[in-house]
Amino acid sequence: MAAPLLHTRLPGDAAASSSAVKKLGASRTGISNMRALENDFFNSPPRKTVRFGGTVTEVLLKYKKGETNDFELLKNQLLDPDIKDDQIINWLLEFRSSIMYLTKDFEQLISIILRLPWLNRSQTVVEEYLAFLGNLVSAQTVFLRPCLSMIASHFVPPRVIIKEGDVDVSDSDDEDDNLPANFDTCHRALQIIARYVPSTPWFLMPILVEKFPFVRKSERTLECYVHNLLRISVYFPTLRHEILELIIEKLLKLDVNASRQGIEDAEETATQTCGGTDSTEGLFNMDEDEETEHETKAGPERLDQMVHPVAERLDILMSLVLSYMKDVCYVDGKVDNGKTKDLYRDLINIFDKLLLPTHASCHVQFFMFYLCSFKLGFAEAFLEHLWKKLQDPSNPAIIRQAAGNYIGSFLARAKFIPLITVKSCLDLLVNWLHIYLNNQDSGTKAFCDVALHGPFYSACQAVFYTFVFRHKQLLSGNLKEGLQYLQSLNFERIVMSQLNPLKICLPSVVNFFAAITNKYQLVFCYTIIERNNRQMLPVIRSTAGGDSVQICTNPLDTFFPFDPCVLKRSKKFIDPIYQVWEDMSAEELQEFKKPMKKDIVEDEDDDFLKGEVPQNDTVIGITPSSFDTHFRSPSSSVGSPPVLYMQPSPL
């Protein structure tokens, strides 16, 4: 069982919400105690403790003259694995009285001192060691980096390696109950050093980058390190932007190696395995009561665990970041506008640098989704930021298209965005689309081409996708006024244009958009859809003989950034503010059912579509290539609307 770690800092319990302030207060108290200890140490004569006689100062001076025997003996005594607390205290007292002589010539000696096992020792050892660090960096700044590196190395659990001969039979995290206290001490050490050397944060950041564990290290190692980085950002606020950027960069590396499909497959396989009968079950359960009790205690933790190993790491770290964000932005249960605005500035810059250019990341972007839920103003600022990215022709097309993807997904999925904001965004997008079409009417590029008009198609899809998710709200209340508003958007001109967005946008989006607009007689898309489907398809010769037909069902390379979160811990932050697809009632489905046409386009090899085909041959069902029970990115498979490929009834 892992030792408790997060109760000292991160939110989740009542005591933790103001932990940052309390932690700083405790640190200041510790520093005051340190000053008193230092005065006592300096005012009291050093105790003679060197076993070989003389003082450390004399040994150092002899070494400079070429007499190295005592110096080698000194090093050997410091390297003694059985060194006692009193010995460490006495050595540190000696070194503090000789601090002016510990120049760069004694780098090897300082390295040995910095490797002393000072944590998990008596409080006197800890306080004396902290005082030594403060004296060392103030008198010999050349050793600042080694001191910071030593402290950063303690931000992860120590490794316990057990060998049998020359073979490592165990290499695991040491789950010491003192781990949280050791982390507290290390943070005190950093703050003490910073008091002596104000430029400490500037030297610290490269070390934190260097010491970041490899992303395939254990979940516990990554959790501890990220936890400690977030704590550093509290008392070194100048480092917050760089620390958050570092963490999110590492999260992205995990994210791109844990696709939704892979996570879902792993969970499904595990569920099927657990649901089956295990022939070996109970074979080695010597004490059934003990086993049952163990499973009961471990139950809640195991329910939150991800089967996919990379997803497990990602989920733990994502939940840490989301907890940290809430802890920073909320003061006494209320959003602090100033603190939230500062954090928003940091995160939007990181979003532009890391997230927007990254294609098909699954979960990391939810940090922006969560932050925007704190107050509507931040959601509107995020939308405005994305809108500027989309319409700015100086931005690369891939960035503009990504901005369109984010706008559509955010408007559709963010439960905290009111209808008036949705309508304002639709007005902006649709007006821009009409202006774009105006500029193409007399041009030579007025034809369907993703390479030429990628941002246009991305904006179209954002409009269609938002409309599909929000059409009930747009038409609720006064149906007549709702229809008048939708008619004012003039979808027909966009759909009928020579740029032919219905050919480029995802079939799942197009077909549901067509069904809804047909129902309310806003625009009739089926003629265009049929014409697009009848166009000549590329035929590729198969090496095994015969011809094969391949269709690109996602020419826009679309993904929906805010598809449902499937990380179990992180979902708890997102679900309350997340708009899931509401399944249609039987009556609503009946309204959409149309006679089936026999010439529906065959399967289009797209793993976006995994829905069940209705068995009723008289009703148009799901074309396997265009829909599934989950209206999501092409790489996804769960969590959204069933999309029926509908054709108008024959006259």
UniProtKB/Swiss-Prot annotation:
The modification Phosphoserine is found at S170, S172, S640. Part of Pol I pre-initiation complex (PIC), in which Pol I core assembles with RRN3 and promoter-bound UTBF and SL1/TIF-IB complex. Interacts with POLR1F, EIF3L, TAF1B and TAF1C. Pfam families: RRN3 (PF05327). Its main location: nucleus. It is found in: Nucleus, Nucleolus. GO terms for biological process: cytoplasm organization; fibroblast proliferation; homeostasis of number of cells; in utero embryonic development; intrinsic apoptotic signaling pathway by p53 class mediator; negative regulation of intrinsic apoptotic signaling pathway by p53 class mediator; nucleolus organization; positive regulation of DNA-templated transcription. Residues 633-643 have a biased composition (Low complexity). It comes from the Eukaryota. Keywords: Nucleus, Phosphoprotein, Transcription, Transcription regulation. GO terms for cellular component: nucleolus; nucleoplasm; nucleus. Residues 557-651 are annotated as: Interaction with EIF3L. Residues 500-651 are annotated as: Interaction with POLR1F. The modification Phosphothreonine is found at T200. Phosphorylation is required for participation in rDNA transcription. Phosphorylated at Thr-200 by MAPK9/JNK2, which abrogates initiation complex formation. GO terms for molecular function: RNA polymerase I core binding; RNA polymerase I core promoter sequence-specific DNA binding; RNA polymerase I general transcription initiation factor activity. This is RNA polymerase I-specific transcription initiation factor RRN3. Residues 624-651 are annotated as: Disordered. Required for efficient transcription initiation by RNA polymerase I (Pol I). Required for the formation of the competent pre-initiation complex (PIC). Belongs to the RRN3 family.
